[in-house]
UniProtKB/Swiss-Prot annotation:
Activity control summary: Subject to allosteric regulation. Activated by AMP and ADP.
GO cellular component terms given for this protein: extracellular matrix; mitochondrial matrix; mitochondrion; phagocytic vesicle
Active site feature: K138
Subunit structure: Homohexamer.
Record-listed substrate binding positions: K102, K126, S394
Subcellular location: Mitochondrion matrix
PANTHER family per UniProt: GLUTAMATE DEHYDROGENASE, GLUTAMATE DEHYDROGENASE 1, MITOCHONDRIAL
E.C. number(s) listed in UniProt: 1.4.1.3
Entry annotated with the keyword Transit peptide: yes
Molecular function terms from GO: ATP binding; glutamate dehydrogenase (NAD+) activity; glutamate dehydrogenase (NADP+) activity; glutamate dehydrogenase [NAD(P)+] activity
Full protein name: Glutamate dehydrogenase, mitochondrial
Reaction(s) catalysed (UniProt annotation): L-glutamate + NAD(+) + H2O = 2-oxoglutarate + NH4(+) + NADH + H(+); L-glutamate + NADP(+) + H2O = 2-oxoglutarate + NH4(+) + NADPH + H(+)
């Protein structure tokens, strides 16, 4: 089995993976890399750049930029050794211009207050970009979930939820969490159950959290929503003439080479949808290794291998990349960072070879790296636009919970009956009968997942078109254009509410 351990520039050139003409940034010191701003400051830098395109007063912009309120809590949990761990939890609500606030909860040892404030800020503008009527929020619990048993994770989740209830930081009309890194359907079900236990008279209590299992009031299509939104967004941008001209790519997904960093919920489903559309996913990276195959990886086989072995290393037919971050530097048509923030920075930006970068993760690029790539002519589809599929479908789930009926239940059969009558009329008119398979395809009424995916596709297309229009009108990059649109939408809410801004 080949190994590209550390993937030095020399070895990359020798293997033909990196052109020799790319400028060498090996002189960048570790101190300079470490000196890049923290996540919250990165977001504020991007915000300030977009704010410069507006004519709003500094005080108005500062109010929009700063986080409204943040909560830090601590609570004890007995571990498997009988000792007591003190667990830190956080929840930040960036903006109350619309309620409820919305944002995920992550379980990670890296969670701190500035991170959740940054993510909450990003959520406000992400919601505005895709016209989801929420303010931004984010939460986290500072643990490594792999170090705790299922029973202990349940205790931690319920204790954290109880504190959110006590502080009025959760509720269908107040603040609605969702899954994030280290959490999933099960944690959301525990949150829903805990909230309902303390709010027995709230008929809409099911809407206190999204990303739940179907049996607990979830919605079909939520699990893959972010990855599918990434697919829809990149597909849309690959139909824009100016993007094709700048990147030298051809229209559509088929035949494109793709590198994905991160193989969690977002990365896996993004990879699946691109593979189904005819793209070649040539490399996939996780924290403990990456694999590369120029002819494309089999995503289902790769996922099965990872579940069995806990790593991609030694996946049959692929080349190992031990230092997984180096996978970002492999030449490809499309690079999709779908892992953590600040993965593309001053230390590795010179080696990024992708023509188009789609930010499936939150904040995967620092401002300096962003500007360098823009100057070099790369196309960057920003996180607040591209990974908004999750919050879009969370919005649909919230609406479902408030209406107390699944999408499609009231109209599916009526649609099928109407289509059947129309089809029979057409068949009798043209004197031709369709096959049963053709009839079933045409007559089929929309199920919940059909409605969800249709709504997500329409949302992503509209948001991409709005971003493109502003970028062309303002002669700016897509991140600044998306943020500009969000800022102006939030300003309109404040003005129509009779706020002092007006």
């Amino acid at each position: 089995m080949q190994s590209l351990a550390r993937l030095s520039r020399t070895s990359l050139v020798q293997k033909g993976l990196v052109p020799q003409t790319i400028k060498n940034y090996s002189s960048v010191s570790q101190a300079e890399i470490d000196n890049e701003p923290r996540f919250l400051e990165c977001f504020k830098t991007f915000f300030d750049k977009a704010a410069g395109l507006t004519n709003l007063k500094p005080g108005v912009l500062n109010n929009m930029k700063e986080c409204n309120v943040a909560l830090r809590v601590e609570f004890p949990i007995k571990n498997e050794h009988g000792d007591v761990d003190i667990i830190a939890g956080y929840r930040a609500q960036h903006s109350h211009h619309r309620l409820p606030c919305k944002g995920g909860i992550r379980f990670s040892e890296e969670v701190d207050l500035q991170e959740v404030m940054a993510l909450a800020s990003l959520m406000t503008y992400k919601c505005a970009v895709v016209d989801v009527p929420f303010g931004g929020a984010k939460g986290g619990v500072r643990i490594d979930p792999k170090k705790y048993t299922v029973a202990q994770r349940e205790k931690i989740t319920r204790a954290y939820t109880l504190l959110l209830c006590q502080k009025n930081f959760i509720g269908p009309g107040v603040d609605v969490p969702a899954p994030d890194m280290g959490t999933g359907e099960q944690e959301m079900a525990w949150i829903r159950d805990t909230y309902q236990a303390f709010n027995t008279n709230d008929v809409d209590s099911m809407a206190c959290v999204t990303g739940k299992p179907i049996s607990s009031g979830g919605i079909r299509g939520r699990t893959e929503a972010t990855g599918l939104g990434v697919f829809y967004g990149i597909r849309e941008f690959l139909s824009y003439e100016e993007v094709l001209k700048k990147t030298g790519l051809t229209p559509g997904i088929k035949g494109k080479s793709i590198v994905i960093q991160g193989f969690g919920n977002v990365g896996y489903f993004a990879a699946k949808f691109f593979e189904q559309a005819g793209a070649k996913v040539i490399a996939v990276a996780e924290h403990n290794g990456a694999v590369y195959n120029a002819d494309g990886l089999n995503i289902d086989a790769l996922n099965k291998y990872k579940l069995q072995h806990g790593t991609f290393i030694d996946f049959p037919g692929a080349t190992n990349i031990v230092d997984s971050v180096k996978a970002l530097e492999i030449p490809c048509d499309i690079l999709i960072p779908a892992a953590l923030e600040k993965q593309i920075h001053i230390g590795n930006v010179a080696d990024i070879q992708a023509k188009l970068i789609g930010e499936a993760a939150n904040g995967p690029m620092t401002p300096r790296a962003d500007q360098i790539l823009l100057n070099r002519g790369h196309v960057i589809i920003p996180d607040l636009l591209l990974n908004a599929g999750g919050v879009t479908v969370s919005y649909f789930e919230w609406l479902k919970n408030l209406s107390h009926v699944r999408f499609g239940r009231l109209n599916k059969k009526w649609e099928e009956s109407s289509k059947k009558l129309l089809l029979e009329f057409v068949e009798s008119t043209v004197n031709k009968k369709l096959s049963e398979a053709e009839r079933s395809l045409i007559i089929h009424g929309a199920d919940e997942i059909d409605i969800v995916r249709s709504g997500l596709e329409d949302t992503m297309q509209n948001a991409c078109a709005e971003t493109r229009k502003t970028a062309n009108e303002k002669n700016t990059d897509y991140r600044s254009a998306a943020l500009y649109n969000a800022i102006m939408k939030i300003k309109a809410v404040y003005e129509s509410s009779g706020n002092v801004f007006s």
